[in-house]
């Protein structure tokens, strides 16, 4: 795989961008996610305007999609249709990695650049700020 154009790190996750939305006239965005042991998606959510296709590269990532648990291993594909609540975690002791393809790419690195500082702050995250950022980019939080 070619070297990432940008890497954004936050809360035990690394997002390695290989193809920006701006590279494809907002048709496709491609990035690799590295999930360190114990890390999880910051806020479970669903997307209003785009679908997400995942492909496992390394280790195991536990996804929850529409209330169902799915174990994603290397070589496993997963399609998450827009409006489907989902989240993920690495509950194992080893790093997991997966590719993520966003279509159409109405969502790109801007979201991660904005949310990373909020999730990297010491102490509990600012939930109203997280919600504001998610909604700005068409992600609807599913919080308890």
Language-model segment annotations:
Residues 24-26, 82-109:
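Ligand-binding loop in jelly-roll beta-barrel domains
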Residues 14, 60-62, 69, 85, ...:
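Structural motif
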Residues 32-36, 46-64, 101-102:
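Short, conserved beta-strand element in jelly-roll/cupin
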Residues 8, 67-85:
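Short acidic-glycine-tyrosine-enriched beta hairpin
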Residues 17, 100, 141-143:
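Structural signal for conserved beta-strand scaffold positions within catalytic alpha/beta enzyme cores
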Residues 42-44, 65-70:
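Short beta-strand segments
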Residues 113-144:
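Acidic/histidine-enriched, glycine/proline-rich intrinsically disordered or flexible terminal extensions
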Residues 8-44, 50-51:
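A short glycine-rich, His/Asp/Glu-containing loop-to-beta-strand
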């Amino acid at each position: 795989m070619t070297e990432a154009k940008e890497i954004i790190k936050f809360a035990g996750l690394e997002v390695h961008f290989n193809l920006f939305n701006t590279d494809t006239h907002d048709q496709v965005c491609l990035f690799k996610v590295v999930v360190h042991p114990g890390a999880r998606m910051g806020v479970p959510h669903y997307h209003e305007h785009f679908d997400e296709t995942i492909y496992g590269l390394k280790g195991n990532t536990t996804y929850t999609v529409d209330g169902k648990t799915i174990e994603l291993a290397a070589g496993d594909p997963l399609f998450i249709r827009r409006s489907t609540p989902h989240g993920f975690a690495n509950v194992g002791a080893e790093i997991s990695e997966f590719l993520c393809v966003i279509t159409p790419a109405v969502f790109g690195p801007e979201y991660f650049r904005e949310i990373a500082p909020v999730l990297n702050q010491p102490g509990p995250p600012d939930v109203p700020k997280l919600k504001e950022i998610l909604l700005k980019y068409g992600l609807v939080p599913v919080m308890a």
